[in-house]
């Protein structure tokens, strides 16, 4: 049974029993007991400071690397709104730095950099999602990760207190950053450098072309399903056990890139999770290697 939630009075927006499937790239998942979109950072800080401490909080980015279970999410689900989407220049004596709200799409940052002749962040065009989500999982592609470009990060803790972390404080590792306690990233400073528009444009086009040729970007998917291992790419292990194209219900292993799971139109979240767990079992049984989910799975498990 879900805990009764007493909600603080805020300037943002609450929705109860809010359907979440349309907020994820898989287009599956149940409802959130409470959905909250804060008006701004002050509103979010007040909310955190005054919410019952026993209430579970889940933070959504763009839903591009997320699987929400069919039974939905207890507690409060938070999605950062437009006030967390700003991009500004920051004066620094040593680096070219831009300040980016955590709710900003990675694609929009890459586009901003092109417009302002800033290089070094082109890889973001190949990573669906938001800046905050990218920091949380140290997302990466095409030879770069967030740890390579993050100068500092601002975050709120569970009590609404603000903290500033330098990149070294975030303990970035492959597909994760390790920090103590609950944090919601609100803003980051990213390092870039001066470059010409043609040079930046060429890099962006190359990344986008590779994505179109190698990934099922026009289907309902959530990006790489599993983390690569020390010695193998995840797709190599999935191919090795013969699961390319395999289906459970409406969920399928992509024929184009078998580390991508796709919703063929009528999949449930359970179909997708069960397919992923079948992959993990088959790979372990045949190779002794345990694949770790890269997709974040949230929500209540079915009984």
Curated annotation (Swiss-Prot):
The active site is at 175, 224 (proton donor), 294. It is an enzyme of class 1 (oxidoreductase). GO terms for cellular component: cytosol. Transmembrane segments: none annotated. GO terms for biological process: cell division; cell wall organization; peptidoglycan biosynthetic process; regulation of cell shape. It catalyses: UDP-N-acetyl-alpha-D-muramate + NADP(+) = UDP-N-acetyl-3-O-(1-carboxyvinyl)-alpha-D-glucosamine + NADPH + H(+). Residues 27-217 form the FAD-binding PCMH-type domain. Pathway: Cell wall biogenesis; peptidoglycan biosynthesis. SUPFAM superfamilies: FAD-binding/transporter-associated domain-like, Uridine diphospho-N-Acetylenolpyruvylglucosamine reductase, MurB, C-terminal domain. Its main location: cytoplasm. HAMAP family: MurB. InterPro entries: FAD-bd_PCMH, FAD-bd_PCMH-like_sf, FAD-bd_PCMH_sub1, FAD-bd_PCMH_sub2, MurB, MurB_C, MurB_C_sf, Oxid_FAD_bind_N. Its EC number is 1.3.1.98. It is found in: Cytoplasm. Belongs to the MurB family. GO terms for molecular function: FAD binding; UDP-N-acetylmuramate dehydrogenase activity. Cell wall formation. Its cofactor is FAD. Keywords: Cell cycle, Cell division, Cell shape, Cell wall biogenesis/degradation, Cytoplasm, FAD, Flavoprotein, NADP, Oxidoreductase, Peptidoglycan synthesis. The keyword Cell wall biogenesis/degradation applies. This is UDP-N-acetylenolpyruvoylglucosamine reductase. It comes from the Bacteria. The keyword Glycoprotein does not apply. Pfam families: FAD_binding_4 (PF01565), MurB_C (PF02873).
